[in-house]
Amino acid sequence: RQRQMCIRDRLDWFLLAEPEHQQMKEWVKALLHLYKSHKAMYEMDQSWEGFEWINADDGYRSIYSFMRHSKGAKKNLLFVCNFTPMARDDYRVGVPRKKQYKLILNSDEEKYGGTGEVRKKIYKAEAKECDGRPYSFAYKLPPYGVAVFEF
């Protein structure tokens, strides 16, 4: 907003003409779609079984990862969030299973204001311990990036 928020004023819709605002709108739209289309985002919201930290202790690099689970852990989501301006070219994240992890949302896409660098969509976990998990995979984590994987 260009001016202070006021309940009586209309929203500054004209700002959507600026690329940064349009990109943020697209990102929020994608997050809302993720929420509505994946039960792991809401099905077990009232239970700790629906949420699991992968790494909540990487404060030095300001990178955090966690999982959201659906009932029966049939469809799960893995989130990796980088809160720094530094890219991590080979960031390794621990995972619970030796499966394929599909990248379904990437904040580094150009439409969200990212670099637009093309990344592969499928990552295969290997038997390499990381984050206290028996398996892991490496991912090129962009600055201020959020990646969401489905498994």
Place the predicted regions along the sequence by residue.
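Carbohydrate-interacting/catalytic domains
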Residues: 4, 8-151
